[in-house]
Amino acid sequence: MNHLQQEQKPMPSLFDRAIILAAQAHAGMRRKGSDTPYIVHPMEAAAIAATMTNDPEILAAAVLHDVVEDTFVTLDEIRQAFGDRVADIVSSESEDKREDRPSADTWLERKQETVDHLSRSTDEAVKIVALADKLSNIRAMHRDVLDIGDALWARFNQKDKAMHAWYYRAVGQALE
């Protein structure tokens, strides 16, 4: 009998369940201006977080960090399925999209709120997930700028690369 034929299978871990939900929630989504499946980003963020901690709640939050902001999944559903701590970390990574205004008009406001929140936070879990998320984003931008150059910036709500540089420097300072 091989491992696939075993009668009793262990219950999926918290992290396994987070991967399943994130994959379902992000199904069919792609990274901005790319053919890369979106799930690659939260999986990379979780892999980065795993270099800093083996805490299953932090790793679950890392893989789930965009589901509330970008999909149909609600924070209450995260809380019910994964508990308060995971939900609180995911909430800390979720921007208020301000659906009543164009995203380009609220970019600076949203990013400043993120920087302010990270500056005030004393929760190491929040900082680990934020760092993992931002590092994954920076890596993707680096790969893409090597491929398409400054055309990269056209895909974002904020078209000015200097503003992106400000944001990631400010996040870095907030995480110190």
Predicted regions and their residues:
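Active-site helical microenvironments for divalent-metal-assisted chemistry
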Residues: 2-176
